[in-house]
Design a protein with these regions (language model features):
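C-terminus-biased signal that marks the final domain/tail of proteins
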Residues: 2-23, 27-207
Length: 207
């Protein structure tokens, strides 16, 4: 009824069989989708849901487009045709849309999950991608503790003897302000769900 005060929040609702992810802007506007069964989603600190019909099960308020038009955030290329609407572009601050900090987070999360390089220029920043191998707890731990080791994204921002947690120009997935990291292994019986926690930076403390 009252809307949402802070801007830029994300929530995941999941059980053993399915997961829904929602991205909220300030007020009453949001977009959400069910993650397809064969897909993996990597959501950094930015919106990455885009079109109105990208996925079979999507959720958004009836005025998500008209509100963006009224605020001057979106102008359809063809009057009355909203096929080019992009939620992430319209509802995100211009300097945050494809901002390098969060692009690197998503890019490197996908790189680890898929075990291959991810090209932002060619493949974009999708909400989710088709998984090419099983998702394991170890894979998730590798993603959540990553400073992009072995890539140019890592080496360009801190030198020998310095900590990646102190890098001022980039925020890694595991970063200086990481206070806790959690992995959830969901079961058919909710009471058997496993939560693995690293009470600090996961690159330094075990789950």
């Amino acid at each position: 009824e009252w809307g949402y005060a802070p801007s830029g929040r994300a929530y995941t609702i999941a059980d053993q069989s399915e997961a829904f992810m929602f991205q909220l802007a300030r007020g009453r506007h949001y977009m959400g989708a069910r993650v397809p069964d064969d897909a993996i989603a990597v959501m950094p600190n930015h919106f990455n849901l885009h079109g109105l019909t990208d996925y079979p099960e999507q959720f958004y308020p009836a005025d998500v487009v008209t509100y963006a038009i009224a605020r001057g955030w979106y102008t359809p290329a063809k009057n009355g045709d909203f096929s080019d609407f992009d939620f992430a572009r319209a509802y995100q601050a211009e300097d945050e849309f494809f901002g390098p900090r969060n692009v690197m987070r998503q890019k490197n999360g996908l790189r680890i999950a898929l075990d291959r390089p991810w090209s932002v220029e060619k493949e974009g920043m999708p909400f989710c991608v088709r998984a090419n191998r099983p998702v394991t707890a170890q894979m998730m731990a590798d993603i959540l503790s990553s400073h992009y080791e072995g890539t140019r994204d890592c080496c360009a921002h801190f030198g020998p003897g310095l900590s990646p947690h102190d890098a001022s120009s980039i925020r890694y997935i595991c970063t200086g302000t990481t206070l806790e990291s959690d992995l959830f292994i969901l079961r058919d019986e909710p009471e058997l769900t496993t939560v693995m926690s690293s009470f600090g930076r996961p690159c330094q403390l075990p789950y």
